[in-house]
Amino acid sequence: MAPLRFSANLSWLFPELSGLPARVRAAGSSGFEAVEVAWPYAETPEALARAAREAGLRLVLINTPPGDQEKGEMGLGAVPGRQAAFREGLEQAVRYAKALGCPRIHLMAGRVPQGADRIAVKAEMEAVFLENLRHAAGVLAQEDLVGLLEPINTRITDPQYFLDTPQQAAAILQKVGRPNLQLQMDIFHWQIMDGNLTGNIREFLPIVGHVQVAQVPGRGEPSSPGELNFPYLFQLLEDEGYKGFVGCEYQPRGDTVEGLSWLRSYWDRRGHPEAGQ
C-alpha cells in the first residue's frame, strides 16, 4: 500500500507568515509536495505559480470565491438569485486553476439566506445547486478539471451552511450524474455531523476526490487531544486504496513547523510517496 500524500492548506497553516508566496515557500521547506488554498484571489496567479515552482510544489485545490462576505455570504452555488455571480466566480476560479495547474475546485454551496427556514427553502436551494453544478461540470470538463462538493458541519462551524452531510452531498452528486464532480471529505466536519467514520469512509470513498483533516473538537493538529484516532484513520485510507491528497486544514496550536511532528513521524514510518504518484 502506498503512503498517503499530504498537502498544506495555506489558509490555515503558517499564519505566522504574511502572504501566500511566503507560506508556499514554508510548506516546501517543511517537506510538503503540495499545497491548497481556499481563496488565492488576493495574489496574482503568476506570483503564486512562481512561488510554487521555486518551492517544487503543486497546487492541488482552490475554492470558488465566497461572494460578498460583508453580507454574510460563504459561497454561492445553492443561493437563489445569485446564479450569475456564481458563474462569474466559477470563471475566475477556472482562470486561476489553469494558470496554477490546479486540478480541483471546491464548488462552495453557500448558506441558507438570513432569516429563512432551512426546511422551507431546501427544495429551492437544491434546485439552484443542481442547475449551477450542471453548468459547472460542463465548464470544468472543457478544461479537464474536477469540481468538489464539501459538506460543512452546521453544529459548530457554520449553522447556516446548506450542504452539511456526506449523505446529502452524495445524493446531489447522483442527481447531477457527472463524473468530474466528486466529494470532498473533511473528516473534521464528518465526525461532528455523523460520526461513524469507518462506515462512512468505506461507503463514500469511491466518490471522494480530496480529503481534509483536523482533530475534533478543537480543530488542531491530528496529534492534538481530541476524539479522533488518526493513525487508525490514515491506515484505513491506505487500506481502502485512497490515492488522492490529504489536506492539512487545521489551526496550529503553536508554531506550524513544530506542530508538524505528527507528519514527520508518519513520513519516518511510511516514507514519502514517489514523485509523480
Curated annotation (Swiss-Prot):
Return one GO MF term: hydroxypyruvate isomerase activity
Stated EC number for the protein is 5.3.1.22
Q: Which reaction is catalysed here?
A: 3-hydroxypyruvate = 2-hydroxy-3-oxopropanoate
* GO-annotated biological processes: glyoxylate metabolic process
The active site of this protein is located at E150 (proton donor/acceptor), E249 (proton donor/acceptor)
What range does the record give for the signal peptide? none
State a single Pfam family of this protein: AP_endonuc_2
> Is Isomerase found in the keyword set?
yes
Q: Does the keyword Isomerase apply?
A: yes
Q: Which domain of life is it from?
A: Eukaryota
| Induction field | Up-regulated by exposure to 7,8-Dihydroxy-9,10-epoxy-7,8,9,10-tetrahydrobenzo[a]pyrene (BPDE) after which is found in the culture medium of amniotic epithelial cells.
Keywords, sorted A to Z? Isomerase
Family as reported in the entry's similarity comment: Belongs to the hyi family.
Summarizing the function annotation, the protein's role is: Catalyzes the reversible isomerization between hydroxypyruvate and 2-hydroxy-3-oxopropanoate (also termed tartronate semialdehyde).
Spell out the protein name for this chain. Putative hydroxypyruvate isomerase
Origin species, per record, is Homo sapiens
